Amino acid sequence: MPLPSRASSTPKISKACVPCRTRKIKCNAAVVGLPCGSCVSRECPDECVLSARKRRTVKGRNAETPRSRKNIPDTNGSVLSPRQQQLPTNVSRQATDSSHSDPVEESIHASHTGSSLRNDTPHSRDRRPPGQTQADLLYLNILQDTVNDTSAAQTDASDHQSNDEPDDSFNSQIHHWNPPPQLDDVDNEYLAKKKVFELPPPRFMENIVKAYFDYVHPFAPILNRTDFIQSYRSGSCCLFLLHAVAAAASLYVTHDVLIGCGYQDRSTAQASFFSKAKLFHDFHCQGDPLSMLQGSMILGAIILDHPSDRDFQYWFHNSVRRASKMGVQNACLRDDGSQKLYRRIWWVLHNRDIFHFFINTQNMRLLANAPPIRPLTEADWETEDMEQWSGILSPISQAQKVSLIAQCELAQIFGNVMSVVTSSTPSAEEIHKRILPLDAWRTSLPERMQLMASFANGEKYHLEALTTSYRFECIMCRLLRRGRWQMSDGGLREWAQQRFRSAIFELDTIVKRVMINNTIQKLPTTFITTITALLALHIESALDAAESSLIRSMARISVQHTMLALDQIRDTPAIKRALPAFEIVLSKNKLYPMSTSDTEQISTIQTIPQDQTLSDGQILQPPPTDMTLPQDDQSFLYGDFIGFDFLDRWQMEQLDFTGIY
């Protein structure tokens, strides 16, 4: 039945409505008026609006008052605010084309329209850092300082000026005068086909968010939990941040949740969410600066099941760049509601900066010259109303807070040690002095975390902190006993050897404990990568001709136990990526019996003839010509294995044995 004409009662229309433009379908709004026939047939007449034209003004570029902007109805991003006009058009033109009718889902998917990118939180309205990034050019910085000084003087001489107009700031006006380039229709179509603007169904996304705050956030609390949940529930959360959260949390959700999101395994899910976040970032679909910083930090703690140029090093450098540009270090000095969040963010970056350098001294310290800030305390966490968010947030425990504080202290200890061993004239006495606080630090953890007898009451935070400390002690002592820093002191090498073996023993004990308690799947990526580093150290000891037969035999036994631990988490992307290389090395050196099920895991690494059968306990000895590891990773399979500096070669960090903190 033809629709009655409404053209007589509406203004003349000469273009398609926003939903039809987004879907690239024919629109009859010019004939029948609004809503058009397509929107009526899809039962979404409220979404049928025209995109706003940018009006020309005679004087100034911000003729619109804040009051008039507030009166503009929220039509899924079709009517752009001045702040939104500087954002990529793909975000602002996306309509909610989801077939779901759940109001919660409509709210969540409203973030596709660009409302998620408005930087209008109370914490970022009234100041440039961290709410607004600093200007990139010197003359703009000088002008900005001049404007700020003049504004401050005028404010002191008159009534306090309201901060409800962030668009009137000098920095915002610069963005209006020099808007970033807009994406064209081809880019929009490409991103839409990649489903960058889509999220899992709300009931599954809720599980993902909860898993993130239960298993990821406690070890890197870089979000304000209640602010995030409010923006997520209202549909105004940055998509880049949501995809990053989903990528990190995909390791901890149940298999049913993965299936509900359309993924068969964790590797596929994590790679998909990671790719969407990466595309969102690469196409400059910018969210607010804080969300982009937080998302980059989350992606910096993710290891995929395949090598990527955008690895943890890339995202860490990107995080430091964004934090410096936002002036987060200055925000840590203020005394307001946002100070706690920015102090935690800055300390997490500070810890990672030291650990990155400690892992490989070829890395440069990015924050070495940053001004010192006051150490974290338990008061640096927000007070939360848990009754309102009890379904998705768990209370923050004493152990969680102490965990991050302890990590900061640990980073300081190892930072002091590295400053000595990398100096021009390191001495054994000075190294002993700098490492001494480590033992007292470990002893104090149980009491500080208020640990109970039950494993669930904070024990995972205790074990994760201990694991990190023993891991980096192993790295340091290994390098000392191998003469990495040209230390000729024989007594120092013997001391390093003893501490190295003790740390290895403690790591073995911790790994066995989490296996017995069946909690290895609940521990963070930093713990998982420690297991791969531990296995590499055991392999090195087992094949080291300089070691005694007892040490080599014990190392072989430890290889078996560590492989059992990895087998429990072999569906984790980081482990799926590392296992094939480990299995080839172990098989070649007859350190680990491989069964038929094991050989299936390395089918992409070697070719097994069809007439060759393997029974349990049989050692697979593939010919070298069948190995197809990347060229950079093949050198350790041949020749003198001990001559290869297994944990130091930079190309081996493709496997991330020790490459993530």
Swiss-Prot record:
GO cellular component terms attached to this protein's record: nucleus
Region (Disordered): 56-132, 151-184
DNA-binding region(s) in UniProt: 17-48
Compartments in which it is found: Nucleus
One BP annotation, GO: DNA-templated transcription
Loss of function: phenotype: Substantially reduces production of fusaric acid.
SUPFAM superfamilies, sorted: Zn2/Cys6 DNA-binding domain (SSF57701)
Gene3D superfamilies attached to this UniProt entry: Zn(2)-C6 fungal-type DNA-binding domain
Coarse class of the protein's main subcellular location: nucleus
Alphabetical keyword list: DNA-binding, Metal-binding, Nucleus, Transcription, Transcription regulation, Zinc
Top-level taxon of the source organism: Eukaryota
Name of protein: Fusaric acid cluster transcription factor FUB12
Gene source species: Gibberella moniliformis (strain M3125 / FGSC 7600) (Maize ear and stalk rot fungus)
